[in-house]
């Protein structure tokens, strides 16, 4: 029945996809259609273009302005149209793009960056430190999707030197510099996001909103000339993306684990490892209320309950049954990152999980569900409406925890209520970024007046963990900060892992899957962050067709 259902959806999507391709007018010759080729050829007869599908949610609603999410938004990626000061390497260390050098003052409050003097925007104007300062001050003042509150001011010292004056030390600033695209001060106006001018590898050629975006190689790019000269991005749901591959109308089509067994003639399945994790919070603290929001949870406040849940989940089973094997076990929000602490890892041990619950006084009742002092071992595990993977993970979690005597009800919710409810009820989240700031955002005490003086997304307080993260931000270099981020996870005595407070349970990192046309060499991918979208074409300029 499952396969029949998939086939029906694909058949419908084929029809829809055909309508899309007619509407956007994909430039595919009859000969190419006959051979199932979407790629175009250059004047030498070599293919130099690709057609890539992405989820509809990947289309940048506000356009290509870094202040409003392009590159530096919720799902970080390289901005393509613009240059950045730094880059991240394959092993997630820091490299250089516009920057030729950078340093930080002894007190950590001033970053000095020198930039190349040979870079031009696509309108012919030279890119200078004034443009860099303008970009960052603009993001500080206007960004609604990224946190630039640590930046006090960016100042151009001369044409090739910019200083970033910080409100507090931020050793991981180079990771921010890797995703903020530099925009031209002289050409910036309210319409910039729709008609961007940059200095990156590609220029925006065409944007048919709701359908496609076409990029062309920047002929004046200062780096190595892109091997792929035209990139067409089609926005569609997974059903339609599969149909596009089956019809030969896409060279790279994003897909999901539920479609991974589909055989598409002329295509191979590419699985990219990620730190796109799924996990859920377990609120810590006694139940209290502030401003109409409930905080804490009488059941999950017990650290032995949290430890039992972490041990009692068979992540291998979950990956096999929910993700068709396309994922890796997650033990933190930052698995495989340079700042990851391997002490986070645990082995599935149902017997030990039961023992922890028993010793903590959680005894099975007549219906098999545990109780203690009138508190039932039960909670609701929320997931975002319409996300079938999160729903399946939530239901699998509920089934597994029932074997421990824990009752879990699952509920689809909207984000308009999920954030507040997560202060007292577990919510299945998706995280994963190329910066250790994600650890800070999840586990560090929120200093704002909102909430109860605990971590932002779920009640949790540990001053030692806070101190390590504060020290990490104040470190003399990003490399020196790694050990401190690792100690924040576990220092041998306290932390956020199994032997510590374990306020979050991490389940899996979801592989990003793509159907790739045979003959197309997709350059080696660095670990993808959260978001099955733009990351795949971070290095599209290095792809090539094998003739």
Language-model-detected regions and their locations in the chain:
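Ligand/substrate-recognition segments at binding pockets and active sites
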Residues: 363-433, 512
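Alpha-helical secondary-structure segments
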Residues: 128-135, 159-163, 200-201, 229-230, ...
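Periplasmic binding protein-like
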Residues: 52-54, 124, 245-246, 252-255, ...
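N-terminal lobe/hinge region of extracytoplasmic solute-binding protein
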Residues: 54-104, 197
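Ligand-site clamp/hinge motif
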Residues: 219-263, 407-409
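Detector for C-terminal structural segments
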Residues: 208, 212, 310-341, 345, ...
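Gly/Pro-rich hinge or "lid" segments in bacterial periplasmic/extracellular proteins
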Residues: 69, 89-93, 169, 175-226, ...
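Surface-exposed binding/hinge segments that line
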Residues: 103, 107-110, 146-186, 519
């Amino acid at each position: 029945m499952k396969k029949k259902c998939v086939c029906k959806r694909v058949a419908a999507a084929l029809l829809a996809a055909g309508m899309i391709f007619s509407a956007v007018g994909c430039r595919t010759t009859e000969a190419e259609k006959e051979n199932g080729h979407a790629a175009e050829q250059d004047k030498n007869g070599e293919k130099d273009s690709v057609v890539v599908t992405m989820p509809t949610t990947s289309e940048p609603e506000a356009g290509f302005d870094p202040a409003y999410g392009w590159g530096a938004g919720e799902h970080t990626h390289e901005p393509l149209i613009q240059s950045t000061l730094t880059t991240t390497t394959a092993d997630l260390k820091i490299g250089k793009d516009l920057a030729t050098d950078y340093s930080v003052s002894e007190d950590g409050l001033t970053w000095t960056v020198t930039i190349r003097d040979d870079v031009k925007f696509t309108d012919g104007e030279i890119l200078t430190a004034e443009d860099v300062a303008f970009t960052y001050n603009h993001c500080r003042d206007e960004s609604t999707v990224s946190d630039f509150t640590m930046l006090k001011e960016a100042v151009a010292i001369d044409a090739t030197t910019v200083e970033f004056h910080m409100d507090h030390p931020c050793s991981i600033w180079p990771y921010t510099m890797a995703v903020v695209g530099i925009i031209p001060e002289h050409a910036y106006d309210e319409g910039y996001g729709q008609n961007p001018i940059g200095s990156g590898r590609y220029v925006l050629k065409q944007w048919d909103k709701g359908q496609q975006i076409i990029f062309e190689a920047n002929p004046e790019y200062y780096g190595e000339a892109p091997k792929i000269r035209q990139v067409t991005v089609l926005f569609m749901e997974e059903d339609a993306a599969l149909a596009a591959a089956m019809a030969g109308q896409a060279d790279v089509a994003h897909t999901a684990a539920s479609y991974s067994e589909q055989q598409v003639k002329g295509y191979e399945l590419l699985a990219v490892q990620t730190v796109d994790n799924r996990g859920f919070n377990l609120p810590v603290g006694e139940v209290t209320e502030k401003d109409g929001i409930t905080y804490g949870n009488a059941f999950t406040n017990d650290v032995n309950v949290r430890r039992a849940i972490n041990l009692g989940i068979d992540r291998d089973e979950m990956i096999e049954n929910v993700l068709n094997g396309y994922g890796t076990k997650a033990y933190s929000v930052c698995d495989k990152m340079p700042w990851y602490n391997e002490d986070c890892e645990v082995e599935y041990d149902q017997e030990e999980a039961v023992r922890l619950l028993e010793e903590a006084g959680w005894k099975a009742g007549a219906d098999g569900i545990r109780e203690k002092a009138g508190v039932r071992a039960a909670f609701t595990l929320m997931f975002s409406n319409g996300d079938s993977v999160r729903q399946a993970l939530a239901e699998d979690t509920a089934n597994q925890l029932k074997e421990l005597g824990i009752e879990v009800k699952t509920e689809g919710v909207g984000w308009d209520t999920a954030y507040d409810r997560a202060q007292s009820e577990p919510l299945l989240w998706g995280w994963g970024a190329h910066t250790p700031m994600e650890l800070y955002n999840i586990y560090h005490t929120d200093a704002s007046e909102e909430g109860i003086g605990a971590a932002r997304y779920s009640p949790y307080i540990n001053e030692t963990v806070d101190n390590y993260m504060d020290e990490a931000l104040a470190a003399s270099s990003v490399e020196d900060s790694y050990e401190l981020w690792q100690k924040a996870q576990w220092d041998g005595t306290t932390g956020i892992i199994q032997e510590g407070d374990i306020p979050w349970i991490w389940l899996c990192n979801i592989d990003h899957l793509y159907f790739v046309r045979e003959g197309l060499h997709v350059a080696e991918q660095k670990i993808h962050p959260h978001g099955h979208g733009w990351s795949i074409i971070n290095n599209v300029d290095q792809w090539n067709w094998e003739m």
